[in-house]
Amino acid sequence: MVTFFKFNKNRINLLCGDLNVSPNEDDVWSHKQLQNVVSHTKIEREKLIKIMNKGKFIDTTRMFISPPENVFTWWSYRSKDFKKNNRGRRLDHIWVTNHQSLESLNAKIMIETRSLPQPSDHVPISYEFNLG
């Protein structure tokens, strides 16, 4: 992956998906309680941030939703009322390189899909941009 982005560094690159890591304290419901839990351990967070920095990626969601506001894309099925408990994590990401050549319009987390019948434990995220 690093090699691909190294050889394509002058292009606009998107990396998106379920990366299964919540890199920032604001990406989990309780940093203190989850710092030793898979998806938010120190080593996972450091490695993901290293990949982001090495690839010169920008976190599109955080372009529009700034810390300290929590951003979650995943809630456990164990919670009967995910909205009330709101014990989520942000495991899904959309990153972009060379964003200065894009007109960034919007990023959205579609939380309402988690309330559908038989939902996924993840909710979709979107990033809207104009290539010019």
Language-model features: locations:
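Hydrophobic side chains in beta-strands
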Residues: 62, 96-97, 109, 129
